[in-house]
Amino acid sequence: MTETRSARIIAVGGGKGGVGKTLVSTNLALALADRGQRTLLVDADLGGANAHTVLGLAPPLSTLSDVVERRATLADVAVVTPYRNLRFVSGALDDISAANPNHSAKMRLLRQIGRVDGVDVVVLDLGAGTGFNTLDFFLLAHTSVLVVLPEPTSVENAYRFLKAAFFRRLAVVERVYGIADVLEVARAQRNSLGVHTPADLLAAIDRKNPDVGRQVRAQMARFEPRLVLNQALPGELGRGGDDDGQVARDMASACRRFLGIPARVLGVLPEDDAVRRAVRQRQPLRLAAPESAIKRALDAVADRLLQEPAHGEVAA
C-alpha cells in the first residue's frame, strides 16, 4: 500500500529565459531518481512547457491544464517514464487559461504538489520572469534554486527575481505582523523611510517595533535561495584555486549585503557542448553524455541537496 506524506519540494527558477532552468531541473530530477529518490518532475512553466523534449518524451496527453481545469488531480496526470524512480507531469501546452490560472485554481494546484502517493521529492521546472505564479511556486518549495549565467544581464535579472520573491513572501508575513503601513510607504521608489533594498526595509521595521522586527527577520530568514551558475568558463570554474566559483560567490555575497537575502552557492556548471548535442538527440544529458563534465557537476549538485536539510517551508 502506498503512503501519502509531504514530499520535499525543490523549485528551479531563473530571472530570465535561456539560463538553463530546464536543463538543471530535468537532470537534477534524473540524478535524484538514480540515487533512489522516488522523484516527480513537474513542468510548471505554465506558458512554455518543454521539459518533455529534454527528457526525450512525446508530449503527454494529460497535462497541468487538466489539473487547473479540475478534470484530473496531479496524481492522475503524473506519468511513469522510462527512467527508474521518475514520474513526470507535463506543463500546460497551448492553453491560455491554464497559463494564467485564477487564485483558487493556483492554490488548489499548490496544495496537491508534494502530496502525491509514493513520492520522496518533487522538482518544479518554473517559467521565466517575476510573475506571481512563478514566484508563488518558487516560494512554495523547501529548497529554491535560482539558475544564473555569468553575464551582467543575467545577474541583474537574478537580483530582480530575488528581490521580487522577497517582497512576495513579505506580503504574506505583513498580514500576520501588522506591518502593512511600513510596506505601503516602502513600495514607493522614493520614500520617506529611505528604503531602497530588502535590508533597508527590515531595518525600518526594526525601528518601528523591534519585537516585530525580530519576528519578521526570523520568518524571512527561512527564504534561503541556492544559486547555480550555468555555462561557466574555465576562469569562473577554477581548479580549486581562489577563483573557484568566484562569480557565484560574489553574487551570493551581494545578495546578503545589499538585499539581506542569505543566498548560498549550490553549484557551478561548466559550459559544455554536450548539452546542445543531447537536446538535438532528444535524450537526457546524463544518458547522451554520461562522462561529460557538466553531468558530473549536476551529480554533485544532487549530492549536495541530499546532504543538506531543507530550509524552506511549504505554504499551506
Residue ranges and their predicted role:
Residues A44-D120, V176, L183-H196, D206, ...:
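P-loop/Walker-type NTP enzyme "switch/lid" segment
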Residues R38-T39, V122, S144, P225:
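Hydrophobic anchor at the start of a short beta-strand
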Residues L46-G48, L93-I96, G129, E151-S154, ...:
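Conserved nucleotide-binding/hydrolysis micro-motifs of P-loop NTPases
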Residues G127-R264:
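Conserved catalytic-core segment of NTP-binding enzymes
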Residues R222-E224, N230-D244, A248-C255, P270-L306:
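Conserved GTP-binding G-domain of TRAFAC-class P-loop NTPases and closely related GTPase folds
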Residues E3-D45:
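Walker A/P-loop phosphate-binding motif and the immediately C-terminal alpha-helix
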Residues M1-I9, A302-A316:
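Acidic-aromatic/histidine active-site loop/patch
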Residues L41-V42, L124, L229:
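Hydrophobic residues in beta-strands of the RecA-like P-loop NTPase core, especially within AAA+ ATPase
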